[in-house]
Amino acid sequence: MPDVIGIDHTYVTVSDLARSERFYDVVMAVLGFRKNRFQIDGEPHVQYYNRHFGYVLRPQHTSAPHDPYAPGLHHLALRVNTAGEVKDAAHRLAERGIPASDPKQYPEYASDYFAVFFSDPDGLRLEITNYRQERRERHDNWKNLEP
């Protein structure tokens, strides 16, 4: 059976590529991503990438607004290692003018769940969260867990 070893890339369709690129230039730089540009069928694309995956912006074809409660993507959570790194990212976003929630613990999700939430220019909800103990245990022992 094939073994999925990670998420290779995510494509996000945006209403204004230049506006979204300015936003993601800040967010992804805070998180250590690099950037390149390319075209597919004459359409410009902007890709942010690190050693784990690529996050690609592409221009919209229709003008329907994003609705996180319609079928499709609700939000994207990017994981950093520690709660301290969540706080650092939130601080850096605030310094660069990106509005976000206060970084804090969310015990209703998990006892060590720490996160900051914000939205991109099209309303796509984004989260930066820590690598929680429950996740570490699941990742380390996934073959022994019940399917």
Description of each model-found segment:
Residues 4-6, 69-73, 110:
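Short glycine-enriched loop/turn motifs at secondary-structure junctions
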Residues 110-111, 117, 128-135:
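Short beta->alpha transition motifs characteristic of CBS
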Residues 1-21, 76, 132-147:
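N-terminal beta-strand motif that seeds the catalytic metal site of vicinal oxygen chelate
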Residues 14-19, 77-122:
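Vicinal oxygen chelate
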Residues 50-88, 95:
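Long, continuous compositionally biased terminal/linker segments
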Residues 11-55:
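Core segments of cupin and vicinal oxygen chelate
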Residues 125:
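Glycine-rich acetyl-CoA-binding "A-motif" of GNAT/NAT acetyltransferases
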